[in-house]
From Swiss-Prot:
Its main location: cytoplasm. The gene is hemH. Belongs to the ferrochelatase family. It comes from Legionella pneumophila (strain Paris). Fe cation binds at residues 187, 286. GO terms for biological process: heme biosynthetic process. Pathway: Porphyrin-containing compound metabolism; protoheme biosynthesis; protoheme from protoporphyrin-IX: step 1/1. Catalyzes the ferrous insertion into protoporphyrin IX. It is found in: Cytoplasm. Keywords: Cytoplasm, Heme biosynthesis, Iron, Lyase, Metal-binding, Porphyrin biosynthesis. SUPFAM superfamilies: Chelatase (SSF53800). Its EC number is 4.98.1.1. This is Ferrochelatase. PANTHER family: FERROCHELATASE, FERROCHELATASE, MITOCHONDRIAL.
Amino acid sequence: MRRGLLLLNLGTPDNADIRAVKLYLREFLTDKRVIDLPTIPRYILVYCLILPFRSPKSAQAYQSIWTEKGSPLLYHSQNLVTKLQSSLKDEYKIALGMRYGTPSITTALAELKDCHSLTILPLFPQYSSAATGSAIEKTLSYLANQEIIPSIKIIRDFYQRPEYIQAQAKIMKPYIKDNFHVLFSYHGIPERHIHKSGCDTLCPQTCTPIYDKNQACYRAQCYQTSLLLAKELQLGTHQYTTAFQSRLGKTPWIKPYTDEIFAELISKGIKNIVVSCPSFVADCLETLEEIGIRAKEQWEKLGGEQFILTPCMNDHPEWIKAIHSIVNEQI
């Protein structure tokens, strides 16, 4: 009997028009792990304040990165499945499930219904309740209602895995030039999510090293990722910076903020930067539009000169090899 491998990612609208984007945002933002408010306040916030104003802006952003093949996140993910299936051959049957939108987690699990064992790999290198936790919860809630539940293995995070670090570094390396500063930009989360992960206080700087108390701290895992990548790329501490992007609303999110770090870098005389987004394994709205378009424009307006965004791992052969190794070690 075959083993199943379920790859999970966040999701994408079906197309880039306002209606599709609004439907996607509604599903995403009403998730209690994403906006962790009681149900009624959460729904008031989403339906009355966020959706009416954010949907048109988000649709415009999606339109700026949409291609003839559709959503970059979706086609990169589908290409990954195809190439990974070729690499793993008959070892696994692979399916892709998106937490929001299509293909859904339910659809993906239906494809794997004949598998006697299931490895669940959320494609989020660093653990967060809002992304990883939500995707795993959705998966397990479906499986809990099945007559036959397969043996299950969950790969919760893989930020510290040498295969991931090496793959990420190999993709970045050709873009790093002399006199360029490296900026690692991670997706941000609200500070209160850090406290819920077991950390009583926010560390003032790097949150490293990882130990029992902060082992599920997203911010700590991000800083540890930067440290490991810098070591692999042979970067000194003065040659790179870590920051967090994509904040939503007025509540405090983890710092420093990517859009505020640029002025600080410019003030230090840095004119050329290479930006990598190690919390994203596939290029998407947050990398291509938020960083590749808006952040680049901001950098240039502040007086910066060269701005290079490295591609995500997408379906790169090194990423295929890394997943192969990570998954097989879980057997």
